[in-house]
């Protein structure tokens, strides 16, 4: 099926237009808009960030989380245990935990493959974007940020809470 250029443009413009009380933003990598959207979403957090991550390696994203923690935002993360045993991940985990971020490791599944943040109980960031340098600069990835959809955010919060409760505290 061939998509007409005008239909594509209309779809892209519609994706960032607020709908009633809801708004949706999208970003892609390696073009840079995915990374920028993730960082911007973290930057605007006021109270809480609950993150689920397969890869926890990206220095700029970890720094943004630490900066949020220093602003008084409570940051919690559930990350895949097996994926994050290498030096880069261990350095990121050590830096994050030394700066107040509460990290739990999940090894209950073949992969803890979620890539999601719930921010302030009203914003959801999700997509294929791993929190790793390869997602920023090498892979074809996507990010979706939804605001003003409390039912959707509540479902993701329940999913996060279930993973948080079964994951192990990082030593």
Where are each of the predicted segments found?
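Bacterial N-terminal signal peptides that target proteins for export
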Residues: 1-8
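Bacterial N-terminal signal peptides
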Residues: 9-16
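Structural recognition of the beta-strand scaffold that forms the well-ordered cores
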Residues: 25-27, 50-52, 76-79, 104-105, ...
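A general structural motif
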Residues: 29-34
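Signature of lipid phosphatidyltransferase scaffolds
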Residues: 36, 119, 124-171
